[in-house]
From Swiss-Prot:
HAMAP family: Ribosomal_uL14
Identification of the protein by name: Large ribosomal subunit protein uL14
Its job: Binds to 23S rRNA. Forms part of two intersubunit bridges in the 70S ribosome.
Organism: Caldanaerobacter subterraneus subsp. tengcongensis (strain DSM 15242 / JCM 11007 / NBRC 100824 / MB4)
Family (UniProt): Belongs to the universal ribosomal protein uL14 family.
Amino acid sequence: MIRPQTRLKVADNTGAKEIMCIRLLGGSNRKYSNVGDIIVASVKSATPGGVVKKGEVVKAVIVRTKKGIARKDGTYIRFDDNAAVIIRDDKQPRGTRIFGPVARELRDKDFMKIISLAPEVL
């Protein structure tokens, strides 16, 4: 469950280390977002020489959350951190590598490039 002002780790190699959610896309009065949802975020910390700079406003897709995700077979999956991948307007990732596992729910939301780059899909 990600809401505005939530800080997330960045799970790609764009140079950003941490982002803060500014806005949840997909509804005017939306309170929370989960895995596979797109958010607008501000880069709070970044490495020198990266693709994105500190203070830049970016779009990102949530790939991991601490809140459990209920699946249709009755199981839950939950991760150790909240993480996102920075994307372009055409839903393609800006980075060329993804770090850490990602949730299988991204496949339903048509983020196939992120699924293929991820080292593990849970």
